[in-house]
Swiss-Prot record:
One GO molecular-function entry: rRNA (adenine-N6,N6-)-dimethyltransferase activity
InterPro entries in the cross-refs: KsgA/Erm (IPR001737), rRNA_Ade_diMease-like_C (IPR023165), rRNA_Ade_Mease_Trfase_CS (IPR020596), rRNA_Ade_methylase_Trfase_N (IPR020598), rRNA_adenine_dimethylase (IPR011530), SAM-dependent_MTases_sf (IPR029063)
Positions contributing to S-adenosyl-L-methionine binding: 23, 25, 50, 71, 95, 110
GO CC list: cytoplasm
Entry protein name: Probable ribosomal RNA small subunit methyltransferase A
Record bears the keyword Zinc: no
Function: Specifically dimethylates two adjacent adenosines in the loop of a conserved hairpin near the 3'-end of 16S rRNA in the 30S particle. May play a critical role in biogenesis of 30S subunits.
Amino acid sequence: MRDRLFSIIYKYNLRPNRTLGQNFLIVPDIIERNVKRAELSEKDTVLEIGPGLGVLTDELSKKAGKVYAIEADSRMIEILQREYSWPNVELIKGDAVKVEWPEFNKMVSNLPYQISSPVTFKLLKHEFERAVLIYQLEFAERMIAKPGDRNYSRLSLMVQAKANVELVERIGRGAFWPRPKVDSAVVVLEPKPEKERIELNENLVKALFQHRRSTVASALKKSAHMLGTDKKSIKDYLSSLPHAEKRVFQLSPEEVLDIEVYLRDNGLLSQKPEKGLN
């Protein structure tokens, strides 16, 4: 697997595009473990973001019934078409953040770090069964952070409102070529049962986490404009606001939902939350 990767690199005299975050995973054991973690069968349709030189794609094609691979680099698309003859892989040229995703039930990817956040939020708006993803370690640690933790963020809250998330393996920099400046981690995401998923108003979450160390009352006053209202209107309702004196970074998804319901019931929030994983 590793020899195959480097033979392609030398054959085409490739230089990774750092703008696109190209760092190729070169440790076969990690690739094999991630494919195993995905629990694939011929019934599965897998989405891969950033197939690069196709090492992971090749393994996915052997286990899944169908694989869609979205690649932004036209050079990589051409190389993959020349080097492989996959009967069940469809390559899609485009920016994974912008293009429409095909239907899939599992995602397995070594994500380009600079699109980790938008891809994750986009994933949470789709139906899926399991995702096995490689992220920058710091990003992965934010995904699993609990309320009150130093790393707890908007990302932590939005992910945990809809999915169970587990950091299952840390990966050193030497596992990639070229060697990145940061460590990485494997994260497994599984949607929560439908009755346990919490749909939150994204504008409200953004407004709160603009001031994550402030109290809820203070954060809402500072970010009133993001909710389409003003400080005075918000201030009039603060005395009965749920969790008003809690720090934003201490809020659980359930507590943010309490705040959302209160604001909506009092006419201070009109936009409905975006649906996903329904």
